[in-house]
Every structure is written in C-alpha cells, then in structure tokens.
Amino acid sequence: MQEKDDTRPLLVVPYMWIGDFVRGHTVVRVLKQRWPNRPIDMLATSLCAPLVDYMHGVRSGIVWDLPRSRLAVVRQWELAAQLRARNYGTAIVLPRTWKSAIAPALAGIPERVGFVGEARFGLINLWRWGEKALPRFIDKNAALALPEGTPVPPEWPVPQLNVPTGEAERWRQANGLGTGAAVALAPGSVGASKRWTYYPEAARLLAEYGLDVWVIGGPGEKALAAEIIAAGGPRVRDLTGTDLRNGILAMAAAEVAISNDSGLMHIAAALGTPTMGIFGPTSPYHWAPLNGLAATVQTKTTVPCQPCHRPVCTMNDHRCMRDIPASDVVAIAGRVLTEAGAPVAH
C-alpha cells in the first residue's frame, strides 16, 4: 500500500503547554501532506481542547487530564481503552516522557513513533535518534512526522487557527465590547522572568490614543488585570478567565495583540492577528511563533546574560525586560495598527 492510500486513523500526542500545543498544528499539517487520507486526532487537556476546534485537519480532540506529577496508572488504562476503540494505526508521541507513551502502548497502537527520550524502549517501537542535533523545538517535533531519515526542511508549514466568519463578532457583541479598534494585552506567562511589568502604563497610553484595551489571560492574571484597569481607565476591560476559547476569540477580534513569550502569543499569531512579542530572557529564534510577528520587541541595551532561559532572573535586576519602556512598545503598536489599517486617534 502506498503512503498516500493509507486511511488508518492517526493519533498525535502533543505537548500540553498552550504555545507548544499550537505548534503541534505544524505536525498535523506535515502529517496531512504525507498521509492526506488519514484522519488525525489529538490528545488535549481540558484547557487546550478548545484549540482543536479551530485546527483544520484535526478530526477530534480526546481530553486527557492526567496529573503532571504522577503516572496515574488507572487513568492511563482508561485512556488506553478509549484509544483502542478508535483503531489507530500510528501514534506520533512528541513529548519525551514515559507518561506520554504509556496509553498508546497499552492501547496496542501498532506504530508508536517518538524519540527514545526517557529510555522508553517497548513503549515507543519506532524510535528516532538525533534529537540533540535538531536546533529548534519545532524541528524536533515536526521531524517525527517525516519518514525516518528525511532531512529537516528549512521551513515548516505554520500553525493555523481558523475562527469561522462571524464567531468573533458574535462573541464581541455578547460581551458588550463595541466596534472600536481594540488592542489585546497578554501580560501573563509561565515564569516570572518572561513578564514585562509595564502593561499598566502601556494600557494608559493606548487608551489615551482612543483605543479599547482588553486584558487576556487565565485566572492567575486577575489581580494584574485589576492593576491595568486602574491605570488605564474605562476603556480597559478584564477578559481573563478559565475558558481558553474566550482568549482565542478575543485575539481573533483584536486589531493587534501585545504579549509576553507565552501561549497566547502563539494563539494570536496562528490566528493571523498582528502580534507583538516582548522577549527578555528567551530567544525569539527558538521560541517565537513560526507564523512570524508584526514586531519582535527586545531591549535596545546590551544585557550580557541575555538570553538566559531561566524562569526567575538570577541577576536580580531583570534588565532584559525592565529596559523596554512602555512608550516604545506603544509607539510600535501605533505603527502596527497603521499598517493593519486600524484607525488610531492621536
């Protein structure tokens, strides 16, 4: 049987951090190029599951809420029973962990592709080697979708999130957000070192330009949203919450998004919303969205320890983020808005 004629269902086991889950759509697109007739499902946490609804080429998401710190063997057996009933021919296991490979193995999926990782002999039966030779995270992931031995291409298909026409507008109306030009701010991130702290001042300046400002994030950003609203005034709205679909639709409806290096940055870019990514301790080469950014914002000063990729600044000055003034970010946002054709009052 030729690869193009294969119709067996295929399972992708992605990383479950939001940004990495979005990158997983590149893997789906590569698989669809290789096997256009194979249905593709993705495992997803409850948090990430809404993303699947906007990923072309994904048949369905299978919710998989396993605790991060335990193997949860009983839950693995329950998941394996679900997978077995779907008759998958292949599982592409992106994470390197034991835990990510257990259920596909218990389900008896014939082809289980992945890097050896945590010595997963037996759990993974189509091993791949050379992971350390691949420079970027996306190269390591998407290479698993290619036939073994295929050279890694210089460019990959970019992730795409497609919100149906009218859905974002209906969401905007339902939330009473009006029709004015809006900037979405995503001030959160995993790791304090990646958080730019001048969002309140940026919100104030954006509001003075006559722009609506939406604060997007999870429940952990509620206090920060209140601080941003206090600085920015009535044009600023708190849209943080527990439902990621809310964040997806907000990013789809906004004229521009300003984000730290976080999952919401990847969502905005994959939606096609002009996105500004603020980078301090992390490298845009390794972690910026494949889709490209309308602006990559970094400090203009030389910071010898940058990038450190540490979750907390060990120098205790956080200069890589502190030396990016709000006025610079807002000026860049004004240019991005103008290029996008959005009206900006000065």
Where are the predicted features?
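Catalytic machinery of carbohydrate-active enzymes
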Residues: 1-346
